[in-house]
């Protein structure tokens, strides 16, 4: 019980630091006049909102019996496994790195899909960029699903900036800010920012390319 409480306190402390870091980056961009005050305010609000939703989803999943705070397996007639595969496969890859097995990984000495779900669905493989990204975070000590998602949330900052810049090509400032707000409130986009998925990273890259 004491170890569990200690683990939760450490996770909470790291989560607070990560949220403050994200807002700190946004404030730095504002101070450097890279973004204006209105965009800084909107971006900070949504970082806070996404962080809160992430934490609520995590504890809801914990209370629903999902040990690691991620939804996976057969639930309400559907099978969920994307977060599961990213989470557990990155853990395996991180262990290989900690054991000094990088050379073996590069040689392909391990199975292409070492993690298999309970429904015999293979993982994404160790060549998957997002799996590698999560494994590196785990390698430096960021292991909880909440903290992994919060780190990933950093991509919302350039997403909001480039969406605003794209909107300003065609719209005035007020309408551009409304565009960013509406986009940020889309249910699907909220999920990509609050679950262990790579979709928000892909959207960010797409906006940068379009700009």
What are these model-predicted stretches?
Residues 82-142:
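Short hydrophobic/aromatic helix or loop-helix immediately within or flanking a transmembrane segment
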Residues 47-48, 150-153, 181-185, 208-209:
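Residue-level signature of the transmembrane alpha-helical core
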Residues 18, 122-125, 130, 134-142, ...:
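Transmembrane alpha-helices of multi-pass, membrane-embedded glycan-processing enzymes
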